[in-house]
Amino acid sequence: MYLRILIAVAAIGAMSLTALAQTSEENDVTRKATAERLVMGEKACYRCDLFQVDLSYQDLDGRDLSGARLRQADLSLSTFDHAKFAGANMSIVNGFGMRAEGSDFTGVDFQDAVLVGGWYGGSKFDNAKFNNANLSGSDLSTASGLTQIQLNTACGDGETKLPKGLVLAPCKAN
């Protein structure tokens, strides 16, 4: 009797794993299609799922990615001038060399993000979270909404440019 129950439970578990794998693949296809629509010119992607998508080397000015899930996305060397990211999850994002002039990053989660060498002229960072974010070489000198409390958990280097009166701890060498 117990053996039959155990076999039934194992079979259900195997079916569940197969369903999860299919769902994961379907989600991956959906995320890639959403990213492609953005690249092709779609402006609004409010609260969309862009987990782990590759948007590197793209010109995505004026896009509305408010509330989007960009966790682990590759945004390296892309341009997001006048884009809206308010409330987005940008944790563990690769934002190397990203340009975002006049963009809105209000309430964005940048935990563990690599924002090395980015340019954020005139962008807003009210209530953004920078836990363990690397801002080395980035220019935030004309950004607004940054506070010392926000930056206390991030790091940078001698090339990082911040608004007057704000400082960053140096990043630890790997």
Regions found by a protein language model. Give the residues of each.
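Bacterial N-terminal signal peptides
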Residues: 6-16
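Positively charged n-region of N-terminal signal peptides that target proteins for export
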Residues: 1-5
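Tandem repeat scaffolds
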Residues: 21-174
